[in-house]
Every structure is written in structure tokens, then in C-alpha cells.
Amino acid sequence: MKSLTAYLVLFMLMVNVSFAQQIEPTFEKQNDLVKATYYYENGTIKEVGFFKDDKLHKQWISYNKEGKIKVVAIYDNGVKNGKWYIVGEDHVKEVTYKSNKIIKVEEVDESEVSFI
């Protein structure tokens, strides 16, 4: 009986460790930028974007666990600038930033957004 209990405990530990494993992000140098890709535990891409001088730069795209786009964001040397798109279940919000400040928020038709 003790050995059965020991095997069950060992099995439970192995299951917990396997679920707790994280997939390491990847970083790829592209000229003066570094492309970063982050992953969910299930292996699907969570986020892709660029760094310049250790600051968020250019386009960043966040995905849900099913691989659908959640957010498209634009940074300029770590500063939120330009149009961001936040994708909901039945709508898309367009948020315009200038120097980290929200300038405008509006709902847009999905057909007007090319990445969906």
C-alpha cells in the first residue's frame, strides 16, 4: 500500500511539473531591432513585437490562446503612439494615442480593419 501511495504522489508531482512548464520566449535580432515572440503554455503565440534599445517599438500584436488577434498596438521608443486596435467578441475599438495619451476612442467596423 505504501508503494502505491508513493507512486500516486510521484505521478501527481510529475503532472504538476509538466503543466507548470513555460515555453521560453524567442528573440531574433533584425538590424537595429529585436523581434520578440512570447508563447502560451500550450505553444500558441501570445505576443509578437519589437524592441529598440530595450524599449517597445513599432507594432506589437497580442493573441488569445486560440490564436486570434486581441490587440494590435504601436509604440515609438516605448511611447504609445498611433492607432491601437482592441478586438472584442463582436466589435473592434480603435484607440488613438499620442505621447502615451488617449486622443480618441471609437468603435470601427471589422470590415475596415485588414488584420482580422
Regions flagged by a language model, labelled:
Residues M1-P25:
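Bacterial Sec-dependent N-terminal signal peptides
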Residues N16-I116:
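Glycine/tyrosine- and acidic-biased, solvent-exposed loop/turn segments at the edges of beta-strands
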